[in-house]
């Protein structure tokens, strides 16, 4: 009993560690670089996009929290989808999420390699990217507690960088920087509020929601949390308020510093805006922060992918050799790391095809969130509040339906974003492919099961047991001899 308790204590993640792991997974390259495209599309109305997306994240996380508190399970949303919407849905959403994340993280490894090459230009991208993936994979083999602490440290670095940028921007806006006049409303006063209209906001929504992507790691880590019924809801509150607050403050202080038309997806908006006001050293510093941001995102994502693979194999949705009953899912982690390596080298060999595949990452995440909401609606309709009456979703069922419909609209708006039409087509194709794979697997299992049943119920042919006959014959001869005597 004492050994079991110490083991539980050793691997239990606190609400703070879960929050920092979620922030580590969320605030990655898509925020530091990808926010440029979203701000270009929406202009100052990007603030509204961040608020709407924050509301969606709030509803998705609390839906996930209700189901997790009701039944903490490895695999989280894929297992809930299988239970509430059918095994086929669990199979498709699990593998679609895994595929999209593997592709996204292999591209993040390429992004880190490009940044690091500024200091070591003679080292190839293949070697740098491969080394990064191997290192992040090996670190994940250390277990949840050590990864939680490492992810917390890396997350703290990039959160500090965002806070530093916000404070520096406030100093510039207020005119407290020596030798620099007060900016005030600055460029914000000259920008139209909605330069792209409703279409611009709709087009930015996918990228903004994608900037929040990664929070689902809380659900994947639920079984390794210390006292999940209390820790998970607390971690969700911390995560939602931290993310929404940081993103809105970031956008609010950025807009006065630089015209949205000057933002480029190749340069962080923070670097571009500070360079514009003579703070050039920020570029090098924020490049280091960007590297730590992507590394922490990769650490958290491989953590989740390893547990997703273990869940899929436990459900019979992945090869049997990937099953792993140990606390740390070594097989799932190594398999995911190797898949990222394959993705990295595929991207270097076939860059055009790889770019098309990467665009499916956003689709995979939004599709996953839609399935979470659909699972939650079914869960509440069938089971009511979780055990103990822990109902956290405000305004159910209306809010759950609003979130589900909003996510579907975000998917349908993908063609409004340059390059994302391919993501919609590729992601939809993946759903079809994984659905076909599931149906083929189910058919083969049914066929195999029917053949086994026929063999078990068919009449058995009589085969003489020669050993029994010999024993009977010997016994008869012994009896005859006894009679003769």
Q: Which residues are covered by each model-predicted region?
A:
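Extracellular loop-to-transmembrane helix junctions
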Residues: 10, 23, 33-128, 239-242, ...
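Helix-loop-helix junctions that connect adjacent transmembrane segments
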Residues: 5-9, 46-47, 121-124, 153-284, ...
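Membrane-interface loop-to-helix entry segments
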Residues: 113, 126-183, 236-237, 358-371, ...
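Membrane-interface "cap" regions at the ends of multi-pass membrane proteins
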Residues: 1-34, 40-45, 58-62, 74, ...
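A generic transmembrane alpha-helix motif of multi-pass inner-membrane proteins
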Residues: 359-365, 393-485
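TM-loop-TM module centered on a large, flexible mid-protein loop between adjacent transmembrane helices
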Residues: 79-82, 86, 118, 191, ...
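Membrane-helix boundary/coupling elements in multi-pass transport proteins
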Residues: 32, 73, 96-110, 212, ...
